[in-house]
């Protein structure tokens, strides 16, 4: 009988009696003893041995020796949860370092327990202590394994259904293939047996010779090779699925074989392989083609091996049949046998898949190439072309002028690089509905700030580069132009042509020239238009003349060297060109300085070039000197300037520069009325920020009025009938698009005209200081005054399509700002030297283009040729370049028949280049 363990918790006599009572009951009557799970805490290291709890011991030899040594204190308390006859506990055991028990004694030690509280309450808790001692847990049987390592947790990984399907397929087909191999071996044995029975006997000279065909060894080796092929095919079929499922365990297996421990967290092998494939297909352009080639070769080899395993032919024959099945899926129709048909159908299916992949690759390659061409990503291989960087509203008129300039050479090539889609750019150019006359326009999508995109359009081989201003504000646009110039200077191959940069602010021009050097030519668009509007306000009709000179449709400026003119004075050179009009000289001795309207005594030297106005660069040449008649002509001095009253409707960014130009042109006592929606205090701040000293103006007086120019009530508050000139500016403070700006200007123009016509009875109150300086008989001024009730109205028009509305109504002289700027850019792109000519003619100092009446040069109905009038103009230090008859609408610049005499009237006017000093 095995005694139950007794816990000696106390040293009193009750513990002994309880211990004796526990040994008396019969074990057969005990079904399930009361159990009590106890938890014991490890004593602190500093506790003495006297405070340690007593430990229980079970002796196998039924020896109740109370003097036995105490068991070790490292036994787990969970082993006392159940008696030994109830089986082991289901609770997870803690790792233990206890050695296996010996055959003599078996000891179960618990973790040292803390003292119970029954020691302090002996009298009151006697029953509690008794029950506690009686219901002490029984130890379980010893643990079979003494390993301290915890049992690994098994994770239930569910395999994919296709893996089980593959296993079932292999289980079915492997016995079947073995059966076929067995049957084939029997047939081979039967065949060998028949061959041995039909041995061939040959008779020779000394006896009978018997030669048998050694078929057995060959048949055996043939069967083995087919078996090996079959096993290779089956293994190859199973291998991808095995790799897919267990590929991530491969590094662990390798580490185990190498006896190394890699505790670092690493990316799974499947993800790493997928990443490498992704990188391979992304970096190398021919990766897809190589993958398709590898798949084709693998299918041919694998299919040939499978055919060799199920057919009786050779391996070479099987590979050839495999290729035919891949190339043509219909070749397997004549196959015989189940195995051969299954393999041939599989190979044909793979061939169809490879063919579909090949079609996809070819289609993708063609689509990618077409998209590249459509999106403008391919390189432009051109020479001597004009490159335009950027996109703006001026591009249409710029392309038109460049196409007209290239007409004489049979056309050219213009390349546009902008940050827009190629299809969108081509669509916008198509909407221009303009005949480019043999000039090709190539659009490319890209950024002018990127060197790769600049090289894509052959920037180093272009004969001229035009940088357009963006639609942003002035500072941002000029900053972007500066970055583009820096990108152009960074081209390693260098630039062959010059760079024309459209600037928005005159203050930023020196910085761009400093960065670009001698290759940079700047055109300050806003400044040019502002000065031109001032000149047109003072001299109506001048806008049409500038439009004819700047455009390539009529006469324009050219500079050329003529050695046969060396030694001649400028007075003789002036009448030496039948088809051109000399305007100046490029002095070689002065560093190539261009002198406009030089003295008559200037003599041409070696290296000097002549500046002329001609139809084209190849339509003029010097001829013999004609005989001209200077004669007697009236010497009328220029009339003194009178004070004028001018109205500005709208606000421009460079309005401070326009005021300074008016200060230089107008007589003292003039008034400038400014009518716009900008508050008066803000106007003063903007004018001061632009460098204008309002209190330092001597000739003009500023009058501020605030209002909306398209509201009739606001316009009626102005004395519109008293102004000499009215300038309608493209109001940048209100509108930001070309169409809206022109609509606003046109509405303001119509309202002013209607208000002036209603105030017609009060027109006598108008100032009598109408411009009389040489224009008392000017038909243009008279027509403009009659059309707009004695006020000259100048409208700034951005869109050329709006010009027709203004010109047909004959209510205003217009200024095409965008088109004139485009003409200037095109002219400077063709010849950068012309930029210095335009800068001087647009400036308030130096020579200028103006309109003079005929009474300065001739008498009424006097018959003279154009050369005679040119000689008379030299007496006033002027160069006459054209005229407008009284009965005509447009002026004629550089007339063709200069020696033909005709009668002139005092209603005619002449276009001259004169000094403004």
Curated annotation (Swiss-Prot):
Biased composition (Low complexity): 7-19, 119-136
Composition-biased stretches (Polar residues): 78-89
TM regions (residue ranges): 160-180, 230-250, 290-310, 342-362
Function, in words: Ion channel with permeability for potassium. Involved in perinuclear calcium spiking but not in cytosolic calcium influx. Required for early signal transduction events leading to endosymbiosis. Acts early in a signal transduction chain leading from the perception of Nod factor to the activation of calcium spiking. Also involved in fungal entry into root epidermal cells during the establishment of the arbuscular mycorrhizal symbiosis.
Domain of life: Eukaryota
Main location: nucleus
Result of altering residue 303 to S: In pollux-1 /Ljsym23-1 and pollux-2 /Ljsym23-2; no nodules formation or arbuscular mycorrhizal symbiosis
Native species: Lotus japonicus
Compartments (UniProt record): Nucleus membrane
Name of the gene this protein is made from: POLLUX
Region feature Disordered, mapped onto this chain: 1-154
Database matches in Gene3D superfamilies: NAD(P)-binding Rossmann-like Domain
Stated name of the protein: Ion channel POLLUX
Tissue-by-tissue expression: Mainly expressed in nodules. Also detected in infected and uninfected roots, leaves, seed pods, and flower buds.
Induction remark: Slightly repressed during the first 2 days after bacterial or Nod factor treatment.
Keyword terms of this UniProt record: Coiled coil, Ion channel, Ion transport, Membrane, Nucleus, Transmembrane, Transmembrane helix, Transport
Any coiled-coil regions, as ranges: 413-435
Assigned protein family: Belongs to the castor/pollux (TC 1.A.1.23) family.
RCK N-terminal domain boundaries: 383-524, 643-792
Gene Ontology annotations for the cellular component aspect, listed alphabetically: nuclear membrane
Subunit structure: Homooligomer.
Membrane topology value: Multi-pass membrane protein
Entry's Gene Ontology BP terms: monoatomic ion transmembrane transport
